[in-house]
A protein has these predicted regions:
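Catalytic P-loop NTP-binding/switch module of NTPases
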Residues: 108-118
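Conserved phosphate-binding/catalytic loops in two-lobed NTP-binding clefts
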Residues: 210-228
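Gly/Thr-rich phosphate-binding beta-strand-loop-beta motif of the actin/hexokinase/Hsp70
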Residues: 66-97, 112
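Phosphate/pyrophosphate-binding loops at sites that engage ATP/ADP/AMP, CoA/4′-phosphopantetheine
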Residues: 172, 176-191
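Residue-level signature of catalytic and energy-coupling elements of molecular machines
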Residues: 43-44, 79, 112, 175, ...
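Short glycine-rich, Thr/Ser-proximal phosphate-binding strand/loop in the N-terminal lobe
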Residues: 94-108
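Nucleotide/phosphate-binding catalytic cleft detector across ATP-hydrolyzing
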Residues: 1-76, 118, 132-161, 182-185, ...
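Glycine-rich phosphate-binding loops at beta-strand->alpha-helix junctions
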Residues: 132-134, 187-211
């Protein structure tokens, strides 16, 4: 999705324009060959359809989730998924940047295994007890079956929240750094739109409002439900 500067003004399609200066901004998006090959195999070889092109999922999600006004004012669409976090930036009505960060909600689960939990138990603990801040249930404990499957032990919710909050802060900080590196940090007047399974963690909205208060005028949480 290239965009252009025509005599200093942003244009999506400069065709037929008269200008003394034309600058094209083009994003190069890379992906492993294996991913494209698998898509082509399924669509063309197995389904017998013609593949017109392959579009990056984060950009498509952002294009349908953000309103035209948000895109024009400057907005950041963040999909905090299980293993990755996608950041898509729009400004002046056009796509500006995409970055996929190599961590997400699963990293919270992996961090919780440091409490001598299996990954399966850590995920269950995350879903039932973890929060994105440490200011709740500080004195609360819960009992879980030990690794031997026989004995039991108690774990403080505060310890769980410390791991979860630290990781969530790191993810948010990397999103901020991505926007800052793009050079439009102070121009995001349309705010941030957050979605993905990672934001289902308790008190995530509280953490977001705390961490992004200096550079966002609006924070929105989107949760999509598959009705099927």
């Amino acid at each position: 999705q290239p965009y252009y500067e025509v005599n200093g003004s942003i244009e999506e399609a400069p065709k037929s324009s008269i200008a003394s200066e034309l600058i094209a901004h083009v994003s190069a998006i890379t992906v492993k060959d294996r991913v494209c090959d698998n898509i082509k195999t399924v669509v063309e070889d197995r389904l017998g359809l013609k593949l017109e092109g392959i579009l990056p999922t984060p950009i498509i999600e952002a294009s349908i989730s953000l309103s035209d006004t948000q895109k024009d004012l400057g907005s950041v669409f963040v999909d905090l998924g299980g293993t990755t976090t996608s950041v898509v930036i729009y400004l002046g009505g056009v796509f500006r940047r995409l970055r996929v960060l190599p961590f997400g909600g699963k990293n919270v689960t992996l961090d919780l295994t440091d409490l001598q939990l299996s990954e399966e138990d850590a995920d269950a603990v995350k879903l039932h007890y973890a929060g994105a801040t440490t200011n709740a249930d500080r004195e609360k404990t819960f009992v879980i079956r030990d690794i031997d499957g026989i004995s039991e032990r108690s774990i403080r919710v505060l310890d769980v929240n410390r791991y979860a909050a630290a990781r969530m802060k790191e993810i948010i900080a990397n999103v901020v750094a991505t926007v800052n590196h793009s050079g439009v940090l102070n121009r995001i007047e349309g705010g941030y739109v957050w979605t993905g399974g990672g934001i289902a963690l308790a008190r995530t909205e509280e953490l977001l409002r705390s961490e992004v208060r200096n550079f966002s005028t609006y924070t929105q949480l989107l949760q999509y439900v598959d009705k099927d």
